[in-house]
From Swiss-Prot:
It comes from the Eukaryota. Its EC number is 6.2.1.1. Belongs to the ATP-dependent AMP-binding enzyme family. Induction: By acetate, acetaldehyde and ethanol. Subject to glucose catabolite repression. Inactivated and degraded after addition of glucose (at protein level). It is found in: Microsome; Cytoplasm; Mitochondrion; Nucleus. It comes from Saccharomyces cerevisiae (strain ATCC 204508 / S288c). This is Acetyl-coenzyme A synthetase 1. The gene is ACS1. A motif (FACS) lies at residues 552-600. SUPFAM superfamilies: Acetyl-CoA synthetase-like. ATP binds at residues 443-445, 467-472, 559, 574, 585. Keywords: ATP-binding, Cytoplasm, Endoplasmic reticulum, Ligase, Microsome, Mitochondrion, Nucleotide-binding, Nucleus. Residues 1-39 are annotated as: Disordered. It catalyses: acetate + ATP + CoA = acetyl-CoA + AMP + diphosphate.
Length: 713
């Protein structure tokens, strides 16, 4: 064959290969489009799961007097309409009915001068009223049902639990309130830092602080000393309350040592109250600064009156990470927050006073504040306080607790459910779980397959799952199904707005409301509600810039959402988790899902980074399964893995979504609640490793250096 013929043959072969590649790309694009259409179809027509009659699940003793608080979906729709159209009537009547006031309020809210609706700019509720949070949580129940269980405690080790009645709780709280007042000099309006594990004394502490009109600032008892120091100083805390040590998952945590380290740089702190949990004599005690819980309590009587506070007086600060990385001290008022906690307890979970409410959350987060402490005690039921973890001493611990204490409502994060699902169903066997009447999910959207496992294995496909969407800033639920036979459920959807929440989906670019049959944009709320946070401590400008200024007239949640043809709301994740590549808006969650489907992948986090050609490009941080077996892989083998994962995305979604970078790492930067901090990944990719902001919420701060080194490689 002549050279020209050979060249011609090669060109034909290349042309053929190009045609094949084009055909594959076209097929891939078509597949991606089909997948999108399929996902749209799923979103808009996923099977609705009706709630079964609840009374069939009740114990006979409860079934004799139980009836749901709402009479089906139409009753919810009627009341929700009233709460939006006449919030003064709705919330005024509820506040009068469910809260005890030392001085009645004379105005429900301050109306917006333009709309007449509750104002974001002047958000104040139940004006000129006075009340006390502790009285509403403890005293009124101790007077009526003194011997009723208020707190059921389950220690880290099985068999270490005990119960506290409302009468006993009142006496304990009154003594600690006097310790704060007379031994420690705390006054109304002072801030008290709390660094305690999940023990009854932590709940007693919060109630004692609120009893004297002070402000509690709980710091999760897993934060480092530096993080604790920063929160003590920012919150202007005068005293700190802690334990000598704590127990979790069979391990001893040196709580007091962390406090001592933090207090080296906290000039405003006068005293530390120490509850000796383990009585370890080697734990340092610095008198006269440090005071012993038991010794001080003995000095005081078992009753001490409440201090009335104004409706808008601060109840607590709770620090949450912001998009800039600097923690925000979110400030909640007293009356509005209490009403939000109580109403969601009543209607979301269909709670009754005979119930045993188990929230598997920590008081260091908003879930613990609202649904371990305030919600259950406001309602007068029993709250179950669990010190341990779902995996210790084995994966049946939650189910053991539910059966032993006849728990009626169980509220937990999908992170824990995924762990328990992975552990296997054998740990659920031999458990009745018949006391359960409602299952809850909190903290992140729950995947449909986890929802279905939760429903089938724990709920026996007989009881509702309330997939709740809310935030530290909201104080209580924003979007949620309602138990008690009210809301037909769609697995993966948070369903409908709670009372008083006028939830809308906005076009992220124009800020206009989207009212189509399938609206997808950013989730916002159109008017204020009682439990909405009032400000960021000492930084109201940041409060405005973060929540109210992005879309004037709305509260900006920071989350993307879709509303389907039936009005169900689907939470799509943070709006900063969207990558714009060559004009294509790509959901990082969608790309992550494609990668995670591969059997060699354990975890994945996708973020965007700047690209000169496409504006943004996609980077995927990937954790492989069986990491030990990959540690000896050659560079060529690792490159093959990366190419394979890129091809997976191209195949599942389309070429436009293919990651430009695949970075293999040992772990991802996660908070202690299991959320991936993608902000850190974005900063590292942008070459801003020295501007990571607050990384104290990471469960493994040491992973940051590994991630930086992996990107450099």
């Amino acid at each position: 064959m002549s050279p020209s013929a050979v060249q011609s043959s090669k060109l034909e072969e290349q042309s053929s290969e190009i045609d094949k590649l084009k055909a594959k790309m076209s097929q891939s694009a078509a597949t991606a489009q089909q997948k999108k259409e399929h996902e749209y179809e799923h979103l808009t027509s996923v099977k609705i799961v009706p709630q079964r009659p609840i009374s069939d699940r009740l114990q006979p003793a409860i079934a004799t007097h139980y009836s749901p608080h709402l009479d089906g979906l139409q009753d919810y729709q009627r009341l929700h309409k009233e709460s939006i159209e006449d919030p003064a009537k709705f919330f005024g009547s509820k506040a009068t009915q469910f809260l005890n006031w030392s001085k009645p309020f004379d105005k429900v809210f301050i109306p917006d001068p333009k709309t007449g609706r509750p104002s974001f700019q002047n958000n104040a509720w139940f004006l000129n009223g006075q009340l006390n949070a502790c009285y509403n949580c403890v005293d009124r129940h101790a007077l009526k049902t003194p011997n009723k269980k208020a707190i059921i405690f389950e220690g880290d080790e099985p068999g270490q639990g005990y119960s506290i009645t409302y009468k006993e709780l009142l006496e304990e709280v009154c003594q600690v309130a006097q310790v704060l007042t007379y031994s420690m000099g705390v006054r109304k309006g002072d801030t008290v830092a709390v660094y305690m594990p999940m023990v009854p004394e932590a709940i007693i502490t919060l109630l004692a602080i609120s009893r004297i009109g002070a402000i509690h600032s709980v710091v999760f008892a897993g934060f480092s000393s530096n993080s604790l120091r920063d929160r003590i100083n920012d919150g202007d805390s005068k005293v700190v309350i802690t334990t000598d040590e704590s127990n979790r998952g069979g391990k001893v945590i040196e709580t007091k040592r962390i406090v001592d380290d933090a207090l080296r740089e906290t000039p405003g702190v006068r005293h530390v109250l120490v509850y000796r949990k383990t009585n370890n004599p080697s734990v340092a005690f610095h008198a006269p600064r440090d005071l012993d819980w038991a010794t001080e309590k003995k000095k005081y009587k078992t009753y001490y009156p409440c201090t009335p506070v104004d409706s808008e007086d601060p109840l607590f600060l709770l620090y949450t990470s912001g998009s800039t990385g600097a923690p925000k001290g979110v400030q909640h008022s007293t009356a509005g927050y209490l009403l939000g906690a109580l109403l969601t307890m009543r209607y979301t979970f269909d709670t009754h006073q005979e119930d045993v409410f188990f929230t598997a959350g920590d008081i260091g987060w908003i879930t613990g504040h609202t649904y371990v402490v305030y919600g259950p005690l406001l309602y007068g039921c029993a709250t179950l306080v669990f010190e341990g973890t779902p995996a210790y001493p084995n994966y049946s611990r939650y189910w053991d607790i539910i059966d032993e204490h006849k728990v009626t409502q169980f509220y937990v994060a999908p992170t824990a459910l995924r762990l328990l699902k992975r552990a296997g169903d054998s740990y659920i066997e031999n458990h009745s779980l018949k006391s359960l009447r409602c299952l809850g999910s909190v903290g992140e959207p729950i995947a449909a397959e986890v929802w279905e496992w939760y429903s089938e294995k724990i709920g026996k496909n007989e009881i509702p799952i309330v997939d709740t969407y809310w935030q530290t800033e909201s104080g209580s639920h924003l979007v949620t199904p309602l138990a008690g036979g009210v809301t037909p459920m769609k697995p993966g959807s948070a369903s409908f707005p709670f009372f008083g929440i006028d939830a809308v989906v906005l076009d992220p670019n124009t800020g206009e409301e989207l009212n189509t049959s399938h609206a997808e944009g950013v989730l916002a709320v159109k008017a204020a509600w009682p439990s909405f946070a009032r400000t960021i401590w000492k930084n109201h400008d940041r409060y405005l810039d973060t929540y109210l200024n992005p879309y004037p007239g709305y509260y900006f949640t920071g989350d993307g959402a879709a509303k389907d043809k039936d009005g169900y709301i689907w939470i799509l994740g943070r709006v900063d988790d969207v990558v714009n590549v060559s004009g294509h808006r790509l959901s990082t969650a969608e790309i992550e899902a494609a990668i995670i489907e591969d059997p060699i992948v354990a975890e994945c986090a996708v973020v965007g980074f700047n690209d000169d050609l496409t504006g943004q490009a996609v980077a995927a941080f990937v954790v492989l399964k069986n990491k030990s077996s990959w540690s000896t892989a050659t560079d060529d083998e690792l490159q093959d893995i990366k190419k394979h994962l890129v091809f997976t995305v191209r195949k599942d979604i389309g070429p436009f979504a293919a990651p430009k970078l695949i970075i293999l790492v040992d772990d991802l930067p996660k908070t202690r609640s299991g959320k991936i901090m993608r902000r850190i990944l974005r900063k590292i990719l942008a070459g801003e490793s020295d501007q990571l902001g607050d990384v104290s919420t990471l469960s493994n701060p040491g992973i940051v250096r590994h991630l930086i080194d992996s990107v450099k490689l």
